[in-house]
Amino acid sequence: MAILINKKTQVICQGFTGLQGTFHSEQAIAYGTNMVGGVTPGKGGHTHLDLPVYNTVHEAKAKTGANASVIYVPPGFAADSILEAIDAEIEVVVCITEGIPVLDMVKVKRALVGSKTRLIGPNCPGVITPGECKIGIMPGHIHKRGTIGIVSRSGTLTYEAVAQTTAVGLGQSTCIGIGGDPVNGTNFVDCIEMFLKDDETKAIIMIGEIGGNAEEDAAEFIKQSKIKKPIVSFIAGITAPPGKRMGHAGAIIVGRTGSAEDKLEALQSAGVIITRSPADIGKTMLDLLNKG
């Protein structure tokens, strides 16, 4: 039944009438996502893209029954937008915004504890259940309904894995970009746990990168999990020099932690199949499933 979102998910957009909110809402509607409205403070009572605009998330939820929100708000205001969605008890919140100050996200992280909200991102491409619901900036046409769950810190590498699994005929159950910032709402462990429990997901692709210990935590979880499914992983940044940030804010090797080799070793010890080239992700998964 996929995870997080499906054709019944009712989505609102925060930052609805802005340039990015408008463009990507149009794309989501064209894909078939059940967009029910949007939020732009001061523009409540108007319509945009033939959908109602509200001043607050609380009002939007009360009027539309929305249970998911996507946020296209500038970095300085994005954390407040997330907090507003948490306060309104929106179940799934996807924040696309890059560059949110770390201390702002620490406040958000604290607010998430004990809340009813699952935050995806920030600095992420979003979530898609192919053929049902697209929340985010990913190109919808490369996705195909299928059985592979994909979770990634990198947006463009997510698209690479999607295109390859589509090309070899496997397709995807749900694809999640968790984002490349050091403080995010949902991590690898959260997503892998959901995929392992999902009957529709037969195998998992996990795309990590240097920096932090999210991949090592995932390896330990996989090792301890009683539910087993085939998992293929690619880690970006094998040639990255220590101390140099590589694209994402969280992609930096500090001291003795966060290197690609450490992550690869941890994942291999958990039984994860490693591919060292992003061009081989789909083929590696297909070969693994054919062997099984």
Curated annotation (Swiss-Prot):
Pfam families: CoA_binding, Ligase_CoA. GO terms for cellular component: succinate-CoA ligase complex (ADP-forming). SUPFAM superfamilies: NAD(P)-binding Rossmann-fold domains, Succinyl-CoA synthetase domains. Substrate binds at Y159. GO terms for biological process: tricarboxylic acid cycle. InterPro entries: Cit_synth/succinyl-CoA_lig_AS (IPR017440), Citrt_syn/SCS-alpha_CS (IPR033847), CoA-bd (IPR003781), CoA_lig_alpha (IPR005810), NAD(P)-bd_dom_sf (IPR036291), SUCC_ACL_C (IPR005811), Succinyl-CoA_synth-like (IPR016102). This is Succinate--CoA ligase [ADP-forming] subunit alpha. It comes from Rickettsia conorii (strain ATCC VR-613 / Malish 7).
